[in-house]
Amino acid sequence: ASLVGSEMCIRDRYNAKNFIMNYLDILPLIPAEEDIVAAVNNDFTILWILLSGILVFFMQAGFTALEAGMTRAKNGVNIAMKNFMDICVATITWVVCGYGLMYGAKTAGFISLGSDVWFNEGAGAHDVFFQLVFAATAATIVSGAIAGRTKYSTYIIFTIFMTAIIYPISGGWQWYGDGAFLADAGFIDFAGSSIVHAVGGFAALVAAAMVGPRIGKFDGGKVNPIPGSNLLLGALGVFILWLGWFGFNGGSQLAWGGADSAAA
């Protein structure tokens, strides 16, 4: 019995030693707690940016409903197609050159001409998507200002120009990072009040001045009201846009949590 007990004791010690040695071998492979936390935060950040981008994307439906409801019924299909093409055209132009013009290496002062992030090369897909829906929103602001007053083909040409050149260059002045001359001068734009809405608004002002008033709006110096075709549809559009603002502001901190949460 004493011999059997000694053998079991030796075996237990051998197994314990092997366990300890194996544990020490794999210990370097176990990520540290802070690495796990950082990885989880990064995953949640990507998820949050994607969800916020989806909310902003859905604002296209809000703009469509608002514009269609507040204009004549005959313009409904034209408005729907213009807003649909906004996101389609913006996707192509943004991936090909828009994102590169906004965030590429600065080689010409006020403009990014570096090709390091053209065609999404070297860029996070979630960030490209989030910035894409911002660019599409800037373009669709113009759609509302000239609803029912311009050709479909003309608007598509403008959307290409807006999302490929105007918005990326103006956005890079503020959001590029080090070297963005507006940011370096102390200018602050948290969620696009100027870069998206002011740029889109000024473009809309120029477009409205170019196309002129709607037919029948002015007659012999008298202003004729043109009521909307469906106020309920317009109200629905307002609520959809309201919902989308939470993605606009909440996602603009580009992180899950952090000090900017209160600002959002």
Question: Across the structure, where does each feature detected by a protein language model lie?
Answer:
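Hydrophobic alpha-helical transmembrane bundles of multi-pass membrane proteins
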Residues: 21-264
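Generic extreme N-terminus detector
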Residues: 12-13, 25
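Single conserved hydrophobic/aromatic residue that forms the stacking wall/gate
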Residues: 1-12
